[in-house]
Amino acid sequence: MLISNIAHDLKTPITAVKGYAEGILDGVANTPEKVDKYVRTIYNKANDMDKLINELTLYSKIDTNRIPYNFAKINVTDYFNDCVEEIGLDLEAKNIRLSYENHVDSNVLIIADPEQIRRVINNIVGNSVKYMNKTQSYIDIRINDVGDFIQVEIEDNGRGIDQRDMPYIFDRFYRADASRNSATGGSGIGLSIVKKIIEDHGGKIWATSKEGDGTTMFFVIRKYQETQDMNRQ
C-alpha cells in the first residue's frame, strides 16, 4: 500500500511537469504570459514532490527513533504569533479566512523544538486546506492555558471526517476515504508524524470532527517550570 501511494503521489506531479515542460519546448506556450504560467506550475509541482520526499525522509527517521530534535525554551506568545503570521500569508492567497486567539500569559514558556512544532502546525493546517469544500472557508487557531499545559486548537470548516475513521486518523498510512485522498495527494503518514512529534515532546494530540461541518485538532505541551527536568535542553 505504501509503495502504491508513493508511486501515485510522485507520478501525478511528474506527469504535470513533463506536460508543461513539453508545452514550452514545443512552442505551445507562445506568449510570455503562458510561459510564466507553465514555469510557475512546474515550480509548484516540483515543490509538491520535494514536500513528499521530505515527509518520507522524516518518516524513515521516525521509524528508527532518529528525529534530530533541538529542544529550547520558547516564549509561547512570540512563537505562535510568528507561526500564525506565516500561515496567514498562505491562507490569504487561497482565500481562506484565518482567526487567532491567544489566551496564554505573555511570559509563558515551553521546552520544544521550534522547527518540529512548526512542522506539526503546518501539517495540520495543510491537511485542513486539502479538504476545504466551502465557498467561505476558515481556519481558527486558539492557544489556551490548561493548568500545567498549553493547549493548541486548530479548527476548520472543511469536509470533516466520518466517525468510523476517527480512531485511525493518526495511524501510519491510513487514509480516510482513500479515493478522496488519492485526488488530493499525500502519503498517509502526515498525521502519524504529527502524533510522534507531539508525544516526543511529552504531549498528547487528539481530534473531534463532524462530517460535513469540519474538524478540530487539539494538542497539549507542558509549560516550562524552573523545577522541571531539563535533560532535553
Where are these predicted regions, by residue range?
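A conserved beta-strand-to-alpha-helix junction within the catalytic ATP-binding
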Residues: 70-88
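Acidic ATP/Mg2+-coordinating residue in the GHKL
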Residues: 156
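Short alpha-helical segment of the dimerization/phosphotransfer core of two-component systems
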Residues: 44-49
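Conserved micro-motifs of the catalytic ATP-binding
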Residues: 64-69, 109-112
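Short conserved segment of the HATPase_c
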Residues: 161-175
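Conserved glycine-rich
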Residues: 202-203
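Short helix-loop "hinge" at the ATP-lid/N-box region of the Bergerat-fold HATPase_c
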Residues: 128-129
